[in-house]
Amino acid sequence: MVDYYEVLDVPRQASSEAIKKAYRKLALKWHPDKNPENKEEAERRFKQVAEAYEVLSDAKKRDIYDRYGEAGAEGGCTGGRPFEDPFEYVFSFRDPADVFREFFGGQDPFSFDLLGNPLENILGGSEELLGKQKQSVCTPFLCLQ
């Protein structure tokens, strides 16, 4: 059985801010692109961290997890009302990369477009010929014009 509090290395009474901070630290640490020499372990840990954050950052999911543990997370416990809404408490986990992008605001900070826009390079930096305007892309770590 996986203990989500242990995965994020936070106490059971941790605030949502502490959970957010722990996720940020561990998601950056275990991101598969930052661990090319140990990719399998990094992917496994990255998924665990994202799953733990999804449950513990949502008040309703966290309450169910605190009451019923992993069985609640898997939909095995519904608080004594088994037929009221059988899907109400089933947790569905998203792709860890989606959780990471949502948390960090857009692009993956570890993937860089080294070639840029090939048409922009060929046309001498002018996208107006293509009928497009340049847009800025900003992440918490980098801002591209």
Swiss-Prot record:
It comes from the Eukaryota. PANTHER family: DNAJ HOMOLOG SUBFAMILY B MEMBER 2, SIMILAR TO DNAJ HOMOLOG SUBFAMILY B MEMBER 6 (HEAT SHOCK PROTEIN J2) (HSJ-2) (MRJ) (MDJ4). This is DnaJ homolog subfamily B member 3. The keyword Chaperone applies. CDD domains: DnaJ. Residues 1-69 form the J domain. InterPro entries: DnaJ_domain, DnaJ_domain_CS, DNJB2/6-like, J_dom_sf. One of its GO terms (molecular function) is Hsp70 protein binding. It comes from Homo sapiens. Keywords: Chaperone. May operate as a co-chaperone of the male germ cell- and haploid stage-specific Hsp70 proteins. SUPFAM superfamilies: Chaperone J-domain (SSF46565). Signal peptide: none annotated.
